[in-house]
Every structure is written in structure tokens, then in C-alpha cells.
Amino acid sequence: MTAFPDVPVIQYEGPQSDNPLAFRWYNPDEVIEGKTMKDHMRFSIVYWHTFRGTGADPFGPGTAVRPWDNGSESVENAQKRAVVAFELFTKLQAPYYAWHDRDVAPEGANLRETHANLDAVADVLEEQQKATGVKLLWGTANMFSNPRFMHGAATSCNADVFAYAGAQVKKALEVTKRLGGENYVFWGGREGYQNLYNTDMKRELDHLAKFFHMAVDYAKSIGFDGQFLIEPKPKEPTKHQYDSDAAACMNFLRAYDLDSHFKLNIETNHATLAGHTMMHELDYAGIQGGLGSIDANTGDLLLGWDTDQFPTDYYLTTQTMLMILKHGGIGTGGVNFDAKVRRESFEPIDLFHAHIGGMDAFAKGLKIAAAIRASGELADFVKNRYSTWDSGIGAKIEAGEVGFAELEAYMLEKGDVDANQSGRQEYLEHMINKYIDRV
């Protein structure tokens, strides 16, 4: 029995369509820069916000109307929920989905029962994947909700908690492999500290690295060849998280000899909380060879927390796709909608409106970014801005042919620097508007 009887499979109808249950910009088979939109985006829908979010907040209970969910933490309810999830995935033409272990299956009375619960729901997930063709983008373990993780998981001061976390990730890796997951994500929501008075940061970082090495070793032992990803976030729920931004993560990975095994899953709202733009985080990760996937959402600049709103801003999606195209795409990663409908958007149909809007925004962002790249206008401006490095003293500096003594001699002879040129920021911002207008 269908959970969404009034919703057809969402189709592309073009920019002039007034149908709210149609794509205006996302045409899966349209080829952009030699790849289809579907292959550029690899759209993914998250299980947690979409099927476990209730609309609850600190000031009131949930508002979401979900007729298929009886509200129980039973395996049977979880299995029923899984069938409904795949109806939504297929009607949105989303090729991927993503989960935390506790999203898809309830925690049991003990670890053995918890594992059995996950296996029972994985049976249904596997059946649904085979029936629909929808694939698992990535799995991960929820090591932040249960009170046992109050001090962290891999960074906990309690060695038993580290051990429990290891057992949980072991199982999550096994199920991710079973379901053909193409990546595995670590997000350290509790991996950090509230106060340094009671914290041995060095020991915690060492433990975190040891945990990741254990994950790499176990993945090899079971033949899981998916990409490991770390998702940066500076705070919330912890005051200071160790995976605070792309730079901190890449430094950590290099310091502990993990950089050949891990890339980054960059989220827009997390970049905002870290005081960065999404463009910055993507460019930095790409420069360092660490761009693996993205969590697509947006935050509210007037609020100081992770609001996980659906992305509908063409400037944001254009900037995001400019960086993804610049760095050669996202490989086995995807554009994963880690976003939730607002508390006031409580009806099932709102799930479709939200995802259609996000998918369309990214599709148009891709087209705009491709148009900017095809014209060469932005690239030529940047190249010309750095032209003094292409010859003369600039080329010698980059080639390592001169040191401070030679630089001093050069300037003593020259007398003063050549005049600087304008950065033309306003011109470039207006230029980007031109492409947004024309696509």
C-alpha cells in the first residue's frame, strides 16, 4: 500500500512549469561538461531528518504527521518505515540514500540485541535496494545520542565507551558493506570538550586516531573498499569539536598518517558555524586532495545554530558547483540532503516540496557554474590577476630559484614594486549575476 498516493514519480517539466510536483531544472539525463546531471549530483536523501525527524524542538513536542509510523521503537515499525522510505526515494528519482545505524533500527536491551535489530532491518533495506535500484551512499554509526557517549565515543575518558563504540562501528561497517555502501562517514558530535580543565586533549586526539586506524584495518579485513569520510563541524552539541573545519581535519589526518584513507564530507551549515563559506571549505578540501562528498543544506545567518534548512539559493548552489567542478567532481560521494523541513511544514507532502526545491536549486547551480566555466571570463580574470607569477621574478620564486638575498638584490635594483591592480570584486559579483540571469 502506497504511503504517498497523490504523489507521482517526479519528472522534469522545464523552467516554465508551474507544477509544484515537477522538476524545473533537474533533468537527470541532461549532459553538462560531459556528464549527466544525475552523475554530477549523485543526489542522496538522508534517513534521519526525513524519516526520524518529528519537528520537536526544546520548546515543544513533534508536529510531523507520519501516518505510516506508529511512534514505537519496534523492529516491525522500523521495517515498515524502510518500505515507505524507498517509495519516497524512487518518486524523487534519488539514486542514493544515507543512514545512521540508529536511524534505521532501534537500540536493543544489550549490544547483541541491537546488532540483531540492525540485521533485521537491513534485510528489508537490501530487499528494497534490489527492487528499486536505489543505492546506499554511506552509512555511519550514531555515537552521540545515547547517554553513554556523554564524554565522547573514541575520545571518551571511559575506556569501556571506546570499546562499545568500536563494536558499534564494526557492525555498522559490516552492514554498510552488505548494502553496497560506497562510503562510510565519521561525524564526531561528542568528540571534543566542554572545558579544558578536565580534558587531556593530547590523549583524546591519540585515541581518536587509534580508533580511525582500527576502522581502516577492519574495513580491509572484511573487504570493504568504500571511501572513509570525516564530516567537519566546530561545535554543537560539543562546545569545541576536534573536527572543527576542513583545515583542522586535514591537519589531523596528516599528523596521524590517515590522509591516504580519509577524505572530507563538507556540510554547508557546518562551514557557516566554523566562520567559513561553503566555497572556502570546498576549495580548501579540494586543494588538499580531501574533497569526498557534501551534505547539502543551508543555515540561517541570523541564528547561531545548525538549522539544516533545504538549499534554495542559486548563489550558494552556483558557488558550490563551481568548486566541485573545479576540483574534478566528488567521486564516490554525492550531494546528500542533510536537511529537514521546518516544524511548521508537518505534512508528508512537504517532504517532496523540500527535496524538489533543493534538487532544482543544485541543478540550476550546476548549469550556471558550467556556463561561467565555458565562457572563461572568471578564469581569465583570475589568471591575469596572478600574471606577475608567470614570468620574471614571480616564476623564479615559484621554481625555488631565489631566496631572500636575491629578492633584496632584485628590489634594490628595481627601486619599488609595480603598481597593484584593482581586485574588481564588485565587477565580478555583477558578472556572476549575469550568468544567473541568463541560464
UniProtKB/Swiss-Prot annotation:
Binding site for Mg(2+) 2: E267, H270, D306, D308
Superkingdom of source: Bacteria
Enzyme type, top EC level: isomerase
Active site: H100, D103
Compartment(s) of residence: Cytoplasm
Molecular functions (GO terms): magnesium ion binding; xylose isomerase activity
Gene3D superfamilies per UniProt: Divalent-metal-dependent TIM barrel enzymes
InterPro entries: Xyl_isomerase-like_sf, Xyl_isomerase-like_TIM-brl, Xylose_isom_bac, Xylose_isomerase
Assembly with partners or alone: Homotetramer.
Annotated family: Belongs to the xylose isomerase family.
Protein name, per record: Xylose isomerase
